[in-house]
């Protein structure tokens, strides 16, 4: 027994020894087997433009985690690359992860098991299955892992840290974010390198680009880089919130935020295609708040300017994102982004001036993203002066020849590659693209030139030739444009350069609020904004808007180079020590070196400084104003320069320089610019720009005083006026040959119409012989139709718009122009009474009995809308009626609606007699020919006794109406000082208004109880209510309103169809005459006698309704009308035609049976034989077009219910 047991123990030892030897051999083989062949280069992660740079990986070998124990050592095969324990981020569970290489039957993958024992069981089961498959035995069941992640399907992998774990490996799959927690940093690095390498290789293999990188041609390298699959080193999964750009551009949702060396890429979940790419140069600022990270991008991005807010896991991740973004931005352009992170926005003025100047005048200097202006090489440099408020700007552009040495500020950086030179925003006002000569009235004194040069040196960021090695390298590490401070050195407006804004900084416009680091560039409201900061060796306090801080201004002493401490009270460069000396000692001493060295340089002739407002003790205003110069009249350059030189000589040099055309009000700090005529004077220079300044010009105070066309509140009352405008006030000018340039603004044949203010502000200048305007420079005469452009205003006819000219017809064509030049007496005394509409010429009749006059200029369309508002003091300028004006009217397209305030005496009701008719309201419906209706009332007949036949004879299509012996007298009445022979109403309709329906489409009915006339249109189920209530003429002309009655409160219940009919009826309230004292007793008898007479049908008008308004016994008239028409009183009373459809049909049948053509000659014969005593029968039936629906109504409930029609309710007054 003992021997057997001993032999068994010996065998077991031998088996264990052999197993251990085999295991050690396998592990040695795995440890010495590389993942890639030794001749193959390792994978480059980050090639191409979309990858984060070059990260070379050393040859990785298989290794084991420190957590693996010896008992876990077993042969696992060559496919296992790395294995070990890691924790899951979500719950912190410890799992056993295994990274496997790609094999013939499986891709590269990451697996994890519950623990190492499970992994060993799976390995043994896999080995047993392989043996069974080889021997043909039964294959045992395999133990699958908990999860398998295919690496080529992963988006990327990244190292991460959050509030809970410091060593995270974040693996981004197609649809999720999977993070693992390592024990230490080395473990994290090892897993990250292997995962990133295997992911990239798997992607390359899938894309067919796996292999050695091509050598030789750059094109081959570029093609290989373009074929590289996207792989990003720094990736975060964020949730873009619907705020800012996320809301406007619909970018909200889950994204992968990928950061590279030059751009930020947003990739949506479940895709690898970039949704948005933002250049790092376009990022204005970035930051984080709690668990939110935000980016503010500029307008050069594809999504426009705005903010992107993203939610991440926690605040630590947001902070890490912020820091990494800043690191990338600093690495890309340290100087630029240091300035941007502190002050990311450019002031409005500087940015606008940059765009204007660079686009119009710097064609060789292209704009780069965000509006930054890039300057190239040594081919040219720009010398800028940007001085705010009381300082002018000078731009001197000088080309440097190849033999000429570069300027001092360019030295020390010429060896830099162009791509690494920082970009600068150059604010170039357009007014500086001219060379200014010294004023002939004042030659700069010798002590002024070094003073100006010292001020130039204080604003520039350059060193002298002696300080090139010492200070040139410090102060000019970037491409900084010198900021020359010519003039008074206004402390708050000077800026830029090494002294006031840090080493190597350059200011936008007039400098900016500078900090110790030289990065404060926005400058508050001013046109400032430092776009480049150096190493921050400058000291500046940043006072106010755009200022260079206390003591940063110029104003150097002539000889010693010590500044005045400019500050906010700096003066005109004459040692006004008003600023804070304590803060500017260092700056003055720093500027002194430039003062002494710059005096030896050759400079362009400096312009004389502007008036010194700070020297008087006043605080310099900045207010954030900037100046824009737009096109001015070049023809007045010499004249204005001579005038300003003369003014400068008389003022003793207070305003020095021809370019100084205006000054600002020192007591006003209004940031708003009034855009009204006559406020800012054009510059007296050769520039193409006109100043739109916020303040009046002190040099031309008399020329541009407060405009007479504004009321007490400062509003401009602009509408066309009859009276000519006043000439533009101007200052005395020197007599020269260019005097004619001013007169062309006042030509009567101008292309503009004077838009004058309201009542009380019209100058009393006499009109010219043509009655036209005397100025064209105040407002444009927009696009008037042809009849108006031949008016007294002297325009040509080439438009289709209707001017709203008060109380005045503007004529109907060029043939009318002679009638307007009858002199001042006729123009100002008689109102216009000409009827502008007539019958069609093919019918052979006109609006008046004079039908033999041929029409003139039929194409001219005297369409007008004339009215005078209440309280207007300008009298109309009418003309006497002429036959030419009556005949010239062809086809019309507009409604002639006149509102004229009548100046008359309110007479007693007993002595007034029959007053003038106030018209009828009609609203045209769309017809087959025209959508407009021409209606004009008030053209008198030469006979005091007006015949109704003559009245209705003007209606096209109404010639066949039997009007035998019909005369309605309209006796004249004295109204004020104007006596007219007769009063009447004349309705002239558009010939194009051919009805689209039959005459029987509408019926008219009179309600005896309410005294109203209803015109019913059965097709539209709409009726027009014409009120005949007496009114007073003293009231202003009313406005007739078509309205739909919301609630119908009739006397009896209505059926469903009747309710619908009643609910859609529109009431037209035409306010009638003063009183209805006249009676026509024989009206009912005359109407009832000819029973066989057909029902009177007047197409397209309510003229008879107007005539009915003159009769007080309208009830009797309509009683006879109903008897003749066969309509019972029950159906006609109380608006029965609206409620009863049968009565309406009777009206239609009667009208349908009438033959207009057959009765045409009969009506004419009756008219010839008719006597003058019998009054005409009032009309029994008329029809009107249904009111036109407004297609542009936005509110179907409200807009369709309110239809307004303006009518003419006034009488034309004449002196026979």
UniProtKB/Swiss-Prot annotation:
Biased composition (Pro residues): 603-612, 722-732
Biased composition (Basic and acidic residues): 465-477, 634-649, 736-747, 839-851
Motif residue range(s): YXXM motif 3: 689-692
Post-translational modification: Phosphorylated on tyrosine residues in response to both insulin and IGF1 signaling. Phosphorylated on Tyr-894 in response to FGF2 signaling. Phosphorylation of Tyr-894 is required for GRB2, phospholipase C-gamma and phosphatidylinositol 3-kinase interaction. Ubiquitinated in a ASB4-dependent manner, leading to proteasomal degradation.
Disordered as annotated region, ranges: 399-799, 816-888, 1168-1204
SMART domains per record: IRS (SM01244), PH (SM00233), PTBI (SM00310)
One Pfam match: IRS
Residue window of motif YXXM motif 1: 480-483
Gly residues: compositionally biased ranges: 488-502, 509-570
GO cellular component, one term: plasma membrane
Domain (PH) ranges: 79-200
Broad class of where this protein is predominantly found: membrane
Basic residues bias spans: 410-424
Subcellular location field: Cell membrane
Residues spanned by motif YXXM motif 7: 894-897
Classification via Gene3D superfamilies: Pleckstrin-homology domain (PH domain)/Phosphotyrosine-binding domain (PTB) (2.30.29.30)
Span list, region CRK-binding: 650-773
Coiled coil: none
Phosphotyrosine found at: 894
Function of the protein: Acts as an interface between multiple growth factor receptors possessing tyrosine kinase activity, such as insulin receptor, IGF1R and FGFR1, and a complex network of intracellular signaling molecules containing SH2 domains. Involved in the IGF1R mitogenic signaling pathway. Promotes the AKT1 signaling pathway and BAD phosphorylation during insulin stimulation without activation of RPS6KB1 or the inhibition of apoptosis. Interaction with GRB2 enhances insulin-stimulated mitogen-activated protein kinase activity. May be involved in nonreceptor tyrosine kinase signaling in myoblasts.
Subunit structure of this chain's protein: Interacts with CRK and CRKL. Interaction with CRK is stronger than with CRKL. Interacts with CRK via the phosphorylated YXXM motifs. Interacts with PLC-gamma, SHC1, PTK6, PPP4C and NISCH. Interacts with SOCS6 in response to stimulation with either insulin or IGF1. Interacts with PIK3R1 and GRB2. Interacts with ASB4; this interaction promotes IRS4 proteasomal degradation.
Protein name, UniProt field: Insulin receptor substrate 4
Source organism: Mus musculus
């Amino acid at each position: 027994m003992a021997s057997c047991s001993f032999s068994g123990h010996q065998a077991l030892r031998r088996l264990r020894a052999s197993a251990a030897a085999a295991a050690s051999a396998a592990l040695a083989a795995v440890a010495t087997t590389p993942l890639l062949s030794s001749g193959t280069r390792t994978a480059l992660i980050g090639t191409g433009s979309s990858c984060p740079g070059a990260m070379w990986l050393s040859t990785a070998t298989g290794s084991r985690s420190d957590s693996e124990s010896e008992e876990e050592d077993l042969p696992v095969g060559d496919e296992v690359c790395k294995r070990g324990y890691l924790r899951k981020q979500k719950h912190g569970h410890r799992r056993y992860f295994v990274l496997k290489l790609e094999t013939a039957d499986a891709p590269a993958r990451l697996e994890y098991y519950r623990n190492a024992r499970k992994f060993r069981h799976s390995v043994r089961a896999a080995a047993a299955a392989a043996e069974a498959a080889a021997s043909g035995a039964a294959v045992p069941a395999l133990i699958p892992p908990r999860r398998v992640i295919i690496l080529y399907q992963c988006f990327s992998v990244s190292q991460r840290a959050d509030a809970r774990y410091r060593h995270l490996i974040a693996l981004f799959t197609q649809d999720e974010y999977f993070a693992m927690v390592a024990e230490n940093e080395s473990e994290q690095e090892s897993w990250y390198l292997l995962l990133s390498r295997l992911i990239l290789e798997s992607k390359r293999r899938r894309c067919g680009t796996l292999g050695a990188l091509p050598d030789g041609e750059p094109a081959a390298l570029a093609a290989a880089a373009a074929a590289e699959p996207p792989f990003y080193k720094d990736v975060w999964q964020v949730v873009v919130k619907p705020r800012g750009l996320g809301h406007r551009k619909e970018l909200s949702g889950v994204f992968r935020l990928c950061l590279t060396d030059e751009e930020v890429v947003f990739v949506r979940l479940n895709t690898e295609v970039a949704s948005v790419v933002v250049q790092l140069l376009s990022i204005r600022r970035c930051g984080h708040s709690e668990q939110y990270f935000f980016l503010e991008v500029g307008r050069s991005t594809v999504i426009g300017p705005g903010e992107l807010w993203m939610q991440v896991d926690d605040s630590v991740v947001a902070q890490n994102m912020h820091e990494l973004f800043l690191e990338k931005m600093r690495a890309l352009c340290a100087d630029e982004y240091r300035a941007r992170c502190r002050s990311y926005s450019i002031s409005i003025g500087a940015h606008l001036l940059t765009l204007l100047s660079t686009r119009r005048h710097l064609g060789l200097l292209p704009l780069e993203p965000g509006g930054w202006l890039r300057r190239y090489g040594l081919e040219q440099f720009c010398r800028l002066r940007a001085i705010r408020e009381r300082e002018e700007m000078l731009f001197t552009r000088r080309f440097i020849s190849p033999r000429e040495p570069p300027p001092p500020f360019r030295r020390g950086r010429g060896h830099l590659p162009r791509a690494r030179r920082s970009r600068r925003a150059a604010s170039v006002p357009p007014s500086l693209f001219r060379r200014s000569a010294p004023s002939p009235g004042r030659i700069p004194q010798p002590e002024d030139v070094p003073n100006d040069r010292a001020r130039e040196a204080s604003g520039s960021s350059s060193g002298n030739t002696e300080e090139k090695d010492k200070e040139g390298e410090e102060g000019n590490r970037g491409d900084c444009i010198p900021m020359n401070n010519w003039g008074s050195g206004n402390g708050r407006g000077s800026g830029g350069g090494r002294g006031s804004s840090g080493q190597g900084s350059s200011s936008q416009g007039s400098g900016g609020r500078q900090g110790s680091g030289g990065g404060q560039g926005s400058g508050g409201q001013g046109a400032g904004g430092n776009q480049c900061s150096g190493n921050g060796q400058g000291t500046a306090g940043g006072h106010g808007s755009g200022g260079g801080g206390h003591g940063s201004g110029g104003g150097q002493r002539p000889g010693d180079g010590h500044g005045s401490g400019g500050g906010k009270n700096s003066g005109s460069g004459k040692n006004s020590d008003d600023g804070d000396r304590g803060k500017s000692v260092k700056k003055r001493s720093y500027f002194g070196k430039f003062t002494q060295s710059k005096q030896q340089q050759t400079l362009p002739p400096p312009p004389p400084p502007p008036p010194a407002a700070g020297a008087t003790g006043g605080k310099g205003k900045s207010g954030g104003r900037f100046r824009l110069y737009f096109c001015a009249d070049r023809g007045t350059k010499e004249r204005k320069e001579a005038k300003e030189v003369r003014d400068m000589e008389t003022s003793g040099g207070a305003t020095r320089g021809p370019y100084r055309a205006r000054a600002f009000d020192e007591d006003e700090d209004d940031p708003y610019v009034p855009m009204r005529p006559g406020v800012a004077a054009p510059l007296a220079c050769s520039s193409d720009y006109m100043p739109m300044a916020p303040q009046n010009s002190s040099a031309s105070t008399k020329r541009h005083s407060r405009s007479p066309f504004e009321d007490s509140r400062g509003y401009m009352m602009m509408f066309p006026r009859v009276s000519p405008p006043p000439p533009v006030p101007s200052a005395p000018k020197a007599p020269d040959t260019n005097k004619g340039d001013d007169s062309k603004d006042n030509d009567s044949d101008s292309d503009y119409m004077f838009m004058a203010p309201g009542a009380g502000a019209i100058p009393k200048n006499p009109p010219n012989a043509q009655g036209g305007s005397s100025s064209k420079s105040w407002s444009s005469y927009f696009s008037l139709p042809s009849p108006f452009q031949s008016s007294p205003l002297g325009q040509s006819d080439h438009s289709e718009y209707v001017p709203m000219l008060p109380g005045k017809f503007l004529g109907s064509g060029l043939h009318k122009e002679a009638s307007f030049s009858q002199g001042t007496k006729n123009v100002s005394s008689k109102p216009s009474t000409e009827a502008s509409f007539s019958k069609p010429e093919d019918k052979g009749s006109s609006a008046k009995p004079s039908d033999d006059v041929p029409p003139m200029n039929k194409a001219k369309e005297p369409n007008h809308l004339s009215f005078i508002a209440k309280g207007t003091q300008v009298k109309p300028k009418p003309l006497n009626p002429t036959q030419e004006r009556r005949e010239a009217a062809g086809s019309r397209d507009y409604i002639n609606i006149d509102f004229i305030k009548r100046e008359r005496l309110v007479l007693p009701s007993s002595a007034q007699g029959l007053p003038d008719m106030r018209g009828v309201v009609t609203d045209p419906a769309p017809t087959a020919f025209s959508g407009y209706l021409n209606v004009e009332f008030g053209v008198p007949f030469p006979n005091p006794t007006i015949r109704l036949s003559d009245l209705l004879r003007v209606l096209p299509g109404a010639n066949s109406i039997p009007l035998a012996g019909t005369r309605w007298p309209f006796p004249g009445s004295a109204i004020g000082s104007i006596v007219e022979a007769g009063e009447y109403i004349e309705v002239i309709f558009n010939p194009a208004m051919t009805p689209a329906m039959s005459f029987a489409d509408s019926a008219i009915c009179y309600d005896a109880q309410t005294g109203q006339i209803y015109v019913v249109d059965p097709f539209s189920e709409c009726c027009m209510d014409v009120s005949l209530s007496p009114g007073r003429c003293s009231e202003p002309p009313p406005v007739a309103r078509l309205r739909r009655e919301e609630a119908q409160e009739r006397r009896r219940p209505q059926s469903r169809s009747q309710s619908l009919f009643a609910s859609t009826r529109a009431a037209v309230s035409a306010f009638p005459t003063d009183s209805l004292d006249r009676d026509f007793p024989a009206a009912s008898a005359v109407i009832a006698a000819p029973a066989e007479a057909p029902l009177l049908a007047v197409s397209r008008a309510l003229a008879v309704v107007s005539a009915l308004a003159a009769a007080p016994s309208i009830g009797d008239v309509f009683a006879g009308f109903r008897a003749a028409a066969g309509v019972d009183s029950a159906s006609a009373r109380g608006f029965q035609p609206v409620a009863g459809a049968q009565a309406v049909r009777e009206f239609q049948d009667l009208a349908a049976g009438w033959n207009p053509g057959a009765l045409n000659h009969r009506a004419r014969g009756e008219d010839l034989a008719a006597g003058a005593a019998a009054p005409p029968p009032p009309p029994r039936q008329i029809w009107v077009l249904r009111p036109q629906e407004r297609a542009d109504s936005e509110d179907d409930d409200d807009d369709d219910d309110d239809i307004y029609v303006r009518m003419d309710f006034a009488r034309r007054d004449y002196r026979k």
